[in-house]
Amino acid sequence: MPSTTLSTVLSDINEFVVKQGHGVKGLSELGLQTLPNQYVHPPEERLSSMDVVSDDSIPVIDVSNWEDPKVAKLICDAAEKRGFFQIVNHGIPLEMLEKAKAATYRFFREPAEEKKKYSKENCPTSHVRYSTSFLPQIEKALEWKDHLSMFYVSDEEAAQYWPPSCRDDALEYLKSCEMVSRKLLEALMQGLNVNEIDDAKESLLMGSRRININYYPKCPNPDLTVGVGRHSDISTLTLLLQDDIGGLYVRKLEHEAWSHVPPVKGALVINIGDALQIMSNGRYKSIEHRVLANETNDRISVPVFVNPKPNDIVGPLPEVLASGEKPVYKPVLYSDYAKHFYRKAHNGKDTIAFARIE
């Protein structure tokens, strides 16, 4: 692209990246030598190598025998002590994982004109959203990331509204995660003295699901920006499929230090969300995490968010409080909690205060 055109693009980043649908991927492909100012984050929001603990590791749990009490204990221990862990031998074939990643590339390689059909301004449903950064309309500094979010309502709605380039493989993968989510939650509920997941509990724990496909293009100055800023998820659980590039960092519990989550072939990264931290009255931990940009490789990831239904009331479970434990959180309408999260830029774990009893 001629330098004059590049200058024009840089003079109105929002027009090119957001309105025209090129995303940050399109910006990266212009051959940038330096990072545009709109993506430069303040030093306190960048991750220094001094803050990274290299000898720390996230647990990797073999769940080939879901019924083994030792497996359930490992899952509960990881949820209490780390909030993040990886699982292997989970039952989803490697071929299906690869198809989900391939579907991600197919969508993001579509022309901008095709991708922008799914933007907030153009898509006929709010359940599908192509966007860049997190909340570009209010963020002081943008994140170096594009994403497509698909909220699952029904197969019929997915057939009508999800992008054809990724729809079938994304839907198949989302459904395959349902069994894994259920097995994880059965184990986690045992640790909270919940012996059975009845219909009401099922709605509360996993009543709604959303799949995102994320694209992090290579960046000219990765040390000046972020792929995703510090935040915790508001889900019950998040199941993340990552590629082999790396870049996900997790905050150590009660520390300022951060640990890298190394890619493990065939693994899923599991993290506890705010909803489950609230339901467990703080026993299970929803931990801050972030994604770094990198200079040499494009990176993709596919998170599946398992959530309560929007009209569910989320609070400490009765079984958790049955022994007389004092509630740390008040009951909140899940849709209100989600609205609180989406009204501001990523800012650590601030959202949990919305439900905390002062």
Swiss-Prot record:
Presence of the UniProt keyword Cell wall biogenesis/degradation in the record: no
Enzyme Commission numbers on file: 1.14.11.61, 1.14.11.62
Biological-process GO terms, alphabetical: coumarin biosynthetic process; phenylpropanoid biosynthetic process; response to fungus; response to molecule of fungal origin
Keyword entries, A-Z: Dioxygenase, Iron, Metal-binding, Oxidoreductase
Function as written in the Swiss-Prot or TrEMBL entry: 2-oxoglutarate (OG)- and Fe(II)-dependent dioxygenase (2OGD) involved in scopoletin and umbelliferone biosynthesis. Converts feruloyl CoA into 6'-hydroxyferuloyl CoA, and p-coumaroyl CoA into 2,4-dihydroxycinnamoyl-CoA, but has no activity with caffeoyl-CoA.
Family statement drawn from the similarity comment of this UniProt entry: Belongs to the iron/ascorbate-dependent oxidoreductase family.
Protein name, entry field: Bi-functional coumaroyl CoA and feruloyl CoA ortho-hydroxylase F6H2-1-1
Originating species: Ipomoea batatas
Gene (name only): F6H2-1-1
